[in-house]
């Protein structure tokens, strides 16, 4: 425990990035949606950070949703989606600014950043988006580019405020969405990479989240291996088989995060059951590792489960 007291959470998170020196401390963090906005969201994030003892402040992107003034009924309508100015993101920037002020001296501030695809499926139902991509990918791409440029405005503003990094998400390539590689590359990966390469140029600590909330992936390695991110938060399965954290580290050749099922013992069990599940992950975890879940945990997950699991990670190698 001496190392924990001697080093700040910021320092301990940075040590995970050093692939040449396995750290003796395993950071940990779990995320949930709080269902509130504004000052209530500031308080909810801070209360959760301190109650769980997690190693960084991860800010949700729940302050606003992309809504279109003109309906998107055909692929050609995607070109009507405007490029949103920085001012449109003010509710999210307000939350970020206040959390930076309150917690940055203590821990890294990591802002969730939805992908262009994730924002697009706020504007229309996901099945409409997928249908439009299959009908006319080039037309849809015009709207995806505008959404990407909008998100770049948010990234630039967040970087100026002093955010340490982003929790960068990708979706859309699932077997039940846009699995076709050519369509995926044109309408999803092209814009993910455009956005996330800019992110990596502006802030130092980015976590790439490959989200399987909507479905599973085939061709996982070739689809995602070249995505940017200092750390990769991976699903628990890919290509119809389990994906261990050690195997994920071999694929991405950088630190990985995850290991626990978001709706498993961490959300629904007792503290002892949550710790037992975490222990199995820690036994085979790669050297450079952050314990977490495959996505957000249940909003009613017991704080005692989360804190017990995080404490176990902190003490596992010390």
Annotated model-derived regions:
Residues 1-31, 44, 55, 84-318:
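Active-site loop segments of alpha/beta catalytic cores
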Residues 15-80:
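N-terminal capping/small domains of soluble enzymes
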């Amino acid at each position: 425990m001496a190392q924990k007291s001697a080093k700040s959470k910021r320092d301990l998170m940075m040590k995970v990035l050093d692939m040449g020196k396995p750290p003796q401390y395993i950071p940990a963090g779990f995320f949930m949606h709080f269902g509130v906005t504004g000052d209530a969201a500031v308080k909810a994030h801070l209360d959760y950070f301190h109650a769980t003892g997690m190693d960084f402040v991860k800010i949700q992107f729940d302050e606003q949703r992309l809504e279109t003034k003109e309906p998107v009924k055909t692929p050609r309508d995607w070109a009507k989606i405007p490029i949103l100015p920085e001012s449109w993101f003010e509710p999210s920037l307000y939350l970020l600014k206040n959390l930076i002020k309150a917690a940055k001296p203590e821990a890294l501030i990591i802002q969730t950043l939805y992908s262009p695809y994730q924002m697009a499926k706020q504007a229309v139902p996901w099945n409409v988006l997928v249908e439009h991509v299959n009908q006319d990918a080039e037309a849809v791409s015009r709207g995806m580019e505008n959404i990407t440029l909008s998100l770049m405005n948010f990234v630039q503003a967040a970087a100026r405020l002093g955010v340490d990094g982003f929790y960068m998400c990708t979706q859309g390539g699932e077997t039940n969405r846009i699995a076709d590689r050519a369509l995926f590359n044109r309408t999803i990966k092209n814009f993910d990479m455009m956005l996330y390469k800019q992110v990596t140029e502006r802030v130092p600590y980015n976590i790439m989240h490959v989200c399987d909330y909507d479905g599973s992936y085939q061709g996982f390695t070739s689809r995602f291996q070249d995505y940017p991110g200092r750390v990769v938060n991976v699903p628990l399965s890919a290509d119809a088989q389990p994906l261990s954290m050690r195997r994920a580290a071999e694929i991405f050749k950088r630190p990985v995060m995850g290991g626990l099922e978001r709706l498993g013992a961490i959300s629904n069990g007792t503290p002892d059951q949550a710790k037992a599940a975490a222990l199995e992950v820690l036994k085979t975890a790669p050297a450079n590792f952050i314990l977490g879940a495959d996505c957000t945990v249940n909003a009613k997950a017991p704080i005692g489960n989360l804190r017990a699991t995080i404490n176990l990670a902190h003490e596992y190698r010390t």
